[in-house]
Swiss-Prot record:
One of its GO terms (molecular function) is glutaminyl-tRNA synthase (glutamine-hydrolyzing) activity. It catalyses: L-glutamyl-tRNA(Gln) + L-glutamine + ATP + H2O = L-glutaminyl-tRNA(Gln) + L-glutamate + ADP + phosphate + H(+). It holds the Pfam family GatD_N. This is Glutamyl-tRNA(Gln) amidotransferase subunit D. Belongs to the asparaginase 1 family. GatD subfamily. Transmembrane segments: none annotated.
């Protein structure tokens, strides 16, 4: 099956009896190219995608190809069953729960497909050094792109993590796509009232078939943290710099993906990470001592009301959107306001009506760094008088997930406000220091 191919490329490959996963060799522009045919996602209909021996994919136009040869056909039908896992002969210390993403996926070169590593043995083969630090067990809970994550899946992840910890695992590693990982981390953090061990979310910015992949180091250090760290919090463990020296363990409610593709994309905001992990030395260096310690039991309370909305203010936005949201049944709105927490004064009357109808309005800042302070300017004071609740230094995404959790437990508006301002798991930092703000590079660089 020539997945993704159409037009000229489909006709060309079909005429040579080539399928995805077949090994081919060709000559083009004086170069000899040999590799495995991969599925195509190209907008052009004359491109063949080939995986080279070095792990990289290239696109080759069929125009000008000479001496095309099918070297070897290899086709296997692979079925991935959700929840499939292989029983362990001995009790595990760390449970790995896969939800999707590239972190524990591998390329099946016989078919050209990317599939999750299903068994404990496959993960050990992925990075044999894991055997040196922990006994692991692995499970595929589901395999989805992180943009398809939903609150109902958060509950399933939380239940699976609790089960793993109740069974005696020292910690849990959750493999997750990076784009919405921070949302899931916040959801799990609010769902657990106590934990016997850490829940470590881990992902990969570079897929495992690429030489520059961050998958092995991120996974290895996440397992190290899950087993050996003294804290029992929901965290995110990702590269701390662009090289492979260390990873950083971020508190799940104070972290954000701040770059589309860098390996060190995840950064703690208005906070410092919990720990730095030097994976080669197998060392966890604690960066703070105010972490939540391991408890005697795992207490789970995972419920979410999805009738919420994240509203990003911009100049000229029509305040009538608030009326629409109220009429659609929304129970709470998190506003990403400007600066210290502002919208135009045109919103004041609409916010008054919303709060009168029992709708919670919470204010965060688009600046991300710093906290909202709605007592400085007249606009902020007017917004507060209309019923808007300033949410300290909470990240907008964290505030949104927290509101889902709060609304699932409370209906009284005053109590909702009180809960939103309660610092449950470190989502609010009352004291900021200059070190929390990144120092951007200000010296000149020469661009070639």
């Amino acid at each position: 099956m020539l997945e993704g191919y159409r037009g000229k490329a489909l006709e060309f490959l079909s005429s040579h009896n080539v399928d995805v996963g077949d090994l081919i060799e060709l000559q083009k522009d004086g170069l000899s190219i040999k590799g495995v045919v991969m599925p195509s996602y190209s907008k052009e209909d004359d491109i063949i995608v080939i995986k080279l021996d070095n792990g990289y994919n290239i696109g080759v136009s069929i125009s000008g190809i000479s001496n095309f040869k099918l070297v070897e056909k290899k086709r296997q039908n692979i079925q991935v069953n959700k929840g499939e896992q292989k029983p362990l002969k001995e009790k595990s210390e760390v449970k790995i729960i896969s939800t999707g993403g590239t972190i524990v996926s591998k390329v099946e070169y016989e078919t050209g497909a990317v599939r999750p590593a299903l068994t404990t043995e496959e993960i050990i083969n992925f990075m044999p050094e894991i055997n040196e630090i922990a006994k692991i067990d692995a499970e595929v809970l589901f395999s989805i792109l992180s943009e398809n994550m939903k609150p109902e899946y958060w509950i399933k992840i939380a239940e699976s993590a609790k089960k793993a910890l109740d069974e005696g695992n020292l910690g849990v590693v959750i493999a997750h796509g990076t784009d919405t990982m921070a949302y899931t981390a916040s959801a799990l953090a609010f769902s657990f009232k106590s934990l016997t061990g850490p829940i470590v979310l881990v992902g990969s910015q570079r897929s495992s078939d690429r030489p520059s992949s961050d998958s092995p180091i991120n996974l290895y250090s996440a397992i190290l943290v899950a087993k050996n760290s003294p804290f029992a919090e929901v965290t995110i463990n990702m590269h701390g710099e662009s090289s492979d020296t260390y990873t950083l363990v971020h508190r799940g409610v104070k972290v954000r993906k701040m770059h589309t593709s860098r390996r060190d994309a995840f950064q703690s905001i208005n906070d410092i990470p919990l720990a730095k992990v030097f994976w080669k030395e197998k060392e966890i260096k604690l960066l703070r001592n105010d972490y939540i310690k391991r408890k005697e039991e795992n207490a789970l309370d995972a419920k979410f009301d999805t009738r919420v909305f994240l509203l990003k203010y911009y100049p000229g936005i029509n305040p009538e959107i608030i009326e629409y949201l109220i009429s659609s049944g929304i129970r709470g709105i998190i506003v990403e306001g400007t600066g210290l927490g502002h919208t135009s004064t045109e919103f004041v009357d609409y916010f008054k009506k919303a709060t009168k109808d029992g709708v919670f309005i919470g204010m965060t800042s688009q600046c991300l760094f710093g906290r909202v302070n709605m007592n400085v300017y007249t606009t902020g004071r007017l917004l507060q008088e209309s019923g808007v609740t300033p949410l300290e230094d909470m990240l907008p995404e964290t505030a949104l997930v927290k509101l889902m959790w709060v609304l699932a437990h409370e209906s009284d508006l005053d109590k909702i406000r009180s809960l939103m301002l309660t610092n449950f798991v470190g989502e609010i930092n009352y004291r900021h220091v200059p070190e929390y703000f990144p120092r951007w590079f200000h010296d000149g660089i020469r661009l070639q």
